[in-house]
């Protein structure tokens, strides 16, 4: 094996180890009966590994070699399809296992290193779990360079002798991309079997920076939107950190994926209008809470977030009865609003046509 391949494997393993610790950690808050309100969403970042990269926001032809992978995943029901992986654990478990914090390793992340296609024979022999880890890393690299992935490349570089387990490896890697990073992996060219990455739930934000150490932040954003909704459409700072601390994410402590988490949540998510950060009325000393911002309300919905929560929980949205009923009401209101807007538009168009016909007849 060449020295460059050894370094690549070492860097990948280091970051994968850190991400595994993050995903295994679950919130240490007890969950009561599933349909009681409010519930706390705590994303189980279980069995998810990898290194990350950066992204831009434009979309081009889905299978071009320089494909730009952004994206808003508008009106795609595939976002909420049920998980089929048996190793995706429930994040709401009251007996959530605790793990060591990421800071124990003092790793601040390492860049995604692309596999060298010409030197693929020098890659180390990997277990199936290792190949899942490596594929997640490869997916994030492709997200960074705005390219699609082909089945042929994945087979050649990663799956290799485990050809009969391709779909298992792809599925497990895709679930980790979804649960940790808020990204969906979808086949965009069924003929050539090309896959692209899309931001989940209709959101258009991933928080990527223009450097090789940048990680997608959408997974954390979805987690917090879920906490806010499940806690009754408002969550105190304390409630947010009760979810994040068991995952090794602490206010004022630099995280290898998220940098300064408090700054990210309180400044960037608020600035991007996904959250509003406001004082709690009549609190003494003053306390603060988070609610959904205008952009979150415009881009996604309570039903989409609830379906994601249920999927992570390995359950059905109807299990969370009060939240499900609330989400249904919002869906009905949105549908009614759209119908009224369409009716107004049709009426205006009809009046315009009538006026035009009248003018012609007068001439």
From Swiss-Prot:
Keyword flag Ribosomal protein: no
Assigned keywords, A-Z: Tumor antigen
Annotated ranges, domain MAGE: 128-327
InterPro entries to which the protein is assigned, alphabetical: MAGE, MAGE_WH1, MAGE_WH2, MHD_dom
Region described as Disordered: 33-124, 342-363
Disulfide bond in keyword set: no
Gene3D superfamilies: MAGE homology domain, winged helix WH1 motif, MAGE homology domain, winged helix WH2 motif
UniProt feature, compositional bias: Low complexity: 82-97
PANTHER family registered for this protein in UniProt: MELANOMA-ASSOCIATED ANTIGEN B16, MELANOMA-ASSOCIATED ANTIGEN MAGE ANTIGEN
Protein name per UniProt: Melanoma-associated antigen B16
Record organism: Mus musculus (Mouse)
